[in-house]
Amino acid sequence: MQKLLSLPPNLIHCFHELEEVNHTDWFCTSDPIGSKLGSGGGTTWLLQACHQAFAPQESFSNWIGHEKRILLHAGGQSRRLPSYGPSGKILTPIPIFSWERGQKLGQNLLSLQLPLYERIMNQAPAGLNTLIASGDVYIRSEKPLQDIPNADVVCYGLWVNPSLATHHGVFVSDRKKPEVLDFMLQKPSLEELEGLSKTHLFLMDIGIWILSDRAIEVLMKRSLKEGTKDITYYDLYSDYGLALGEHPKTKDEEINQLSVAILPLPGGEFYHYGTSHELISSTLAIQDKVRDQRRIMHRKVKPNPAIFIQNSITQVSLSADNANLWIENSHVGKEWKLGSRQIITGVPENQWSINLPDGVCIDIIPIGENEFVARPYGLDDVFKGALDKITTTYLNVPFTRWMEDRGITWEDIKGRTDDLQSASIFPKVASVEDLGILVRWMTSEPQLEEGKKLWLKAEKVSADEISANANLKRLYEQRNAFRKENWKGLAANYEKSVFYQLNLLDAANEFVRFNLGMPDVLKEDAAPMLRIHNRMLRARIMKLHEDKDCAKEEQAAFQLLRDGLLGVMSERKSHPILNVYSDQIVWGRSPVRIDVAGGWTDTPPYSLYSGGSVVNLAIELNGQPPLQVYVKPCKEYHITLRSIDMGAMEVIRNYEELQDYKKVGSPFSIPKAALTLAGFAPAFSTESYPSLAKQLEDFGSGIEITLLAAIPAGSGLGTSSILASTVLGAINDFCGLAWDKNDICSYTLVLEQLLTTGGGWQDQYGGVFSGIKLLQSEAGFEQNPLVRWLPDQLFVHPDYRDCHLLYYTGITRTAKSILAEIVSSMFLNSGPHLSLLAEMKAHAMDMSEAILRSNFESFGRLVGKTWIQNQALDCGTNPPAVAAIIEKIKDYTLGYKLPGAGGGGYLYMVAKDPQAAGQIRRILTEQAPNPRARFVEMTLSDKGLQVSRS
């Protein structure tokens, strides 16, 4: 997906280097210097330039349809936000959100904007290939997107207060057809909106438009001077937009004929970054969005919530009086006195003594190889108007008064005086000391004679010239130097900083890039989750340094996770008592599970800090529960373990043999760990015994356990976890432990930690509890999911029953290596992984809703969406052998997925109807991919785990 950016001219030559992106995926240009094209003309210019750069030999109509593109308009003079004019507002650094995990310390507006636009375009139907958006807004949506209709123009809007809508474009729809645009208005009055409200609904335009190839060609045609190929001023919103809809305000036959769909952005939030005020107010609004202290991870309390400091060294104490303060890429020394309503950017390391008045901002811009420009300004300045007009303000006073206060005459100002933006009033110097004197004279000390002399002597440039000639590489180098120091401080001050909530994959790369020493191992009194993050970060840094000990560090992180989960349970010790007659057998059996939405969100550590949501169903195979366990007493005081399916047997005579359960692939790891948890090992027993034999003697018999897993390994149906639950359930009954089904599931999670296989809770809950259910857990080390049963109509009704197909692919893949990879990403707060997991949690709620409504088609489509999400999380989910099977039958399905971690095992398919199901059966039976592949009859289990006695 290509990104096309319209940027300030000075930025386009170094954008790729500064942002470390490639030229293929990112295309940059700027509007022709001196010409105003508007958003419509600018779109035409941007697309034409990209077409010429990548495929000049191909016709435009062919080229536009080949690929999806995101266009961001981010040029302009930035008069009302001078501090980020030179580098473009779209690259404005944005502070880490106090309540969010997985963000990068170096994030900017562009990196925050893009994920939503990519989500939209990934969901857009074929033919809708071009998304257009503005570069000075941040739009958030945490909810799943609705389906995007196949219209020529699709626009997103927000439900807002009418007073806010008067400052923006507004989509107006008839109340009877809310999804269809009736007409569009630009900045309507409150009276206008009130008059419309009886018959119409209105949404505020948030500037996200998707255009079909046809709509793009019409837009481009309107952007050209009639009869020429010259681009003229044409606005996407006020010209093109007003001609859209069923009753458009502007008549234009070709545009009028375009179909339009209006979509409210689900859970949408709109933050504007167009002015100095908005830089602070929008950032404050984002930070203030979450007040629940349980979601705010750091323990620092700022003296004022509207203080934002990033990429900077500050050596002054701040108080509640320093409201609306923004410091970025700057050194603020001990001798500075700050007020409120101030933006300080670009200030190099200095020894200045300066008293900055309220509302006064400082921007220092590197220019050339070693010079700086001093640009102080007022927070309310708009950099507009002739210098001799009383309405033209600079540093919050009329410009003429600023001149008078400093004894400057008109002869002292060379060049243009008709527009403050173009006036050469900002001095250029090489000395940082002189820079400080100039700033003092220009802001708070107008009588400072030395400052006046320096100003008169210096070459001076305008705001326009600053943007055109700023040395952005030097600006970024300074920012990186400050950020390097910030990394050290954040790591050292981890208890009160955002350090361990950051994207630690990015942090590891930065530590290596800046050649920083590794963070120390945290002390044992640190919070368990912080200690886990710390060890995994250290492991990642060591891996980047090709240090062979990185595996040990990684294992330390996993061990801390196990200790955390075991810590909660280790207090629950057991005293097993023989609870059967000498000739009785306890028989446990369980179904397996298919997860249809939210799988992976149940996996620690993600579920521990975010909670999980999963929809899954318990199924029997070929009419019976496939996992079975038999427990009976034996006369000898030892433990005999047998596996029918593996043809294996082992006799255990001591604690050492019993606790040797960490070998992956061992046929008896599960029963050994289960017996340990049941109190047959010192760590989990209420009593102390000198030996296992002595404990069994006190117990009253030896134990014989026989396992039968009538299902292949690596099936993806939660076999190992549910088998563990079945063993625990049978032992629970045999030993009179009085555990309920929730206890059994909790112990299963601990058992998997003992085995070092990891894993979440959805497998055991899916098999132990019957039917189809929504499972939800809260954050915390003690994971006790709430079980909500969903109706089984879609699985048992004759219209749908035969549409659920289960096919064994004959391909296997062990989940442990997949788990370790994804869990490492969770430990490291990988931003893309966390975003996807949050989407998967929300998707589980959509799936639950579809089942509650008995909407079969929606259910099937959502299963397909789950499969797409699983592949995004792990690229090995759909190997070529599996993809080849799917290719044969996909046209007959509403959705399909490999249950569990994927990569092999069983393929679950939702056929469009019983006839399609018949076709799928025929195709895969006739064209089986290997001798083991076969259909298996699946039925919904109405019992879950069952335990009975002979």
Regions inferred by a protein language model and the residue ranges of each:
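N-terminal glycine-rich phosphate-binding loop and ensuing alpha1 helix
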Residues: 1-129, 133, 138-146, 387, ...
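Stable alpha-helical structural segments in soluble proteins, enriched in small hydrophobic residues
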Residues: 46, 113, 556-564, 674, ...
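Conserved core of the sugar-phosphate nucleotidyltransferase
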Residues: 64-66, 85-86, 92-228
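Short beta-strand segments
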Residues: 71-74, 131-134, 156-159, 212, ...
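Short helix/loop capping segments that flank catalytic or ligand/cofactor-binding pockets
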Residues: 80-82, 140-142, 164-166, 192-194, ...
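DPxDG-like acidic metal-binding loop motif
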Residues: 87, 91, 715-737
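C-terminal nucleotide
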Residues: 444-697, 746-757, 764-898, 908-950
